[in-house]
């Protein structure tokens, strides 16, 4: 007797990987091509993955929203909204805003590192740790640039360096991956559910009182564009509505930014100025980094150890959430194998925090996942 081995034939959809880009094609159901460099897989636009205009547009709007919040946090934490400090630095209000904007732009550039290095997540801040960071920094007075008293900046540099070191240790040793794999399913479910609850609480407690109608309508619009089955079916039949659906929460964001001030008058109408914005990397290096201020004293590092450990513990839940989200999404994507490696993700977070601690200490710090609002 002859035994016949039946091979399961995979049906490849028509038009799969037939375009000019990316130059390096992937086989159906396989991992995206990349250049293996240690734990990383370098993927370059147009070579290893195609360019998506819809995702670029969504990223621009979402990035600008966080840019504004990050710039405000930087200015208030480092005393850049104080007239005396503005005068001591030799700027006007617009000048210090551009200096603070430089922090946000460098952080936004670092958002590209996960995609570049093969980490299949959209990065963000360590948002739940922000109140702890601000409380830690309150031990030191606001910087006084006229006298050179900048202990708070030294403390922020030390804290972010220790957070970066935590990510490095957990990623390089593999402990981070083992911990993520060891988390029981019940706790994973709690983390996934908790991320959504945290985002909702943040929106309704912090932002609802300021603009209740705007927030309520924007939330309903987001749910409609993301989860409504009727709209999803309509998007499959219309190229225009498919593009709109692929923008995620951007339509709701545009409503809040543009239409809400006109129709509801709950928030001021934004003033848009077109043109190139000059940044102040030189001034940031001189006044906020080890290259201009010198290395922080060891006392700052000792004081920052508890806050750094607490920050990593908070960020750890994002690794668990990222793994579960990627696993769930992959089940609906038979065309591609997506691999989330917690060790690699830890190392990418190390690089982002290390870069920011050296060149523009970032108060919200750099987390592995964009998980809360």
What are these regions (language model features)?
Residues 2-149:
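N-terminal signal-anchor module of multipass membrane proteins
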Residues 150-266:
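Membrane-embedded alpha-helical modules
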Residues 175-183, 200-207, 275-280, 284-287, ...:
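Hydrophobic alpha-helical segments of integral membrane proteins
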Residues 41-60, 76-112, 309-373:
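Membrane-embedded helical hairpins/re-entrant loop segments and their flanking transmembrane helices
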Residues 155-160, 206-210, 290-309:
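Hydrophobic alpha-helical transmembrane segments
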Residues 3-8, 19-25, 212, 224-288, ...:
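Flexible hinge motifs at transmembrane-helix junctions and intramembrane kinks/re-entrant loops
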Residues 63-83, 104-116, 159-173, 189-199, ...:
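Transmembrane alpha-helical segments of multi-pass membrane transport proteins and ion-pumping complexes
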Residues 54-71, 94-95, 118-124, 154-155, ...:
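Helical membrane-embedded segments and adjacent short helical loop/helix-boundary regions
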